[in-house]
A protein has these predicted regions:
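Fe(II)/2-oxoglutarate oxygenase catalytic core
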Residues: 1-195, 203-234
């Protein structure tokens, strides 16, 4: 993890490189990639990529499960550093494993929970988003438009439920192609198997730079809040 508290975390070796290669190979073999969209529209000057949403496709269920497992493990690590990513949005009460008493979840109590206790709480509040595989072609592809992940769209306002973004780098060695964060003045260099987590809001406005000597492959999605009716009932 980084030393500076900029809320951008990169977890190296989060996914085995062999699995990353399989994702790339299956993506290319599928022939199902389509031009990437921005906010529902096709604007190649803003985003030039070939995309494949694997969620909901039976033939990709194994890969989707493996990726969500890796992301969840990283999410627990992230919330152990940034406790209020979980406890600031929603007041939660749990049974303290030490004495069984009902207590409000605060930073001290969260830190005392092991993964077995913390995991179900996190799953109660958050859910995984649809996973998108993307290819950015050498010297041309990229997402040069400065953007964030949080915006109002659709009757269900699904994008407004996004809390964190994540990107898994599936290959490296192509030069450039960094994920660049505007306000943090930070560039994340792709490294096979590394998993990036960062907030979805405008504070972490970012862009994807063009790869130089080879195609860049990523898997990407979000950690979203569950719907209000799940968390609060009704």
């Amino acid at each position: 993890m980084s030393d500076a508290a900029d809320f951008i975390e990169v977890y190296h070796d989060a996914v085995d490189p062999a699995l990353c290669r399989q994702l790339v190979e299956r993506f290319e073999a599928s022939g199902d990639g389509v031009p990437g969209k921005v906010g529902g529209g096709l604007y190649p000057e803003l985003k030039d990529s070939l995309d494949l949403t694997i969620s909901g496709r039976p033939e990709w269920a194994d890969m989707e499960a493996a990726l969500n497992q890796a992301v969840f493990a990283a999410l627990l690590r992230y919330l152990r550093r940034y406790h209020y990513g979980l406890i600031a949005p929603i007041m939660l009460e749990i049974s303290d494993p030490a004495d069984g008493a009902r207590k409000r979840l605060d930073a001290d109590l969260l830190q005392r929970l092991d993964d077995q206790a913390l995991g179900p709480i996190v799953q109660y509040v958050f859910r995984p988003g649809a996973i998108n595989l993307q290819r950015y072609s050498a010297g041309r592809g990229g997402y040069p438009y400065w953007h964030c992940e949080l915006y109002p769209r659709g009757a269900d306002a699904e994008p407004l439920h996004r809390h964190l973004l994540w990107t898994l780098y599936l290959n490296d060695g192509f030069g450039a192609g960094e994920t660049e964060f505007l306000y943090q003045r930070r560039k994340i260099e792709p490294r096979t198997g590394s998993l990036l987590l960062a907030p979805a809001a405008f504070t972490h406005t970012h862009r994807g730079n063009t790869p130089a000597q080879g195609d860049k492959y990523i898997a990407t999605s979000w950690i979203l809040f569950r719907r209000a009716e799940h968390i609060f009932g009704g």
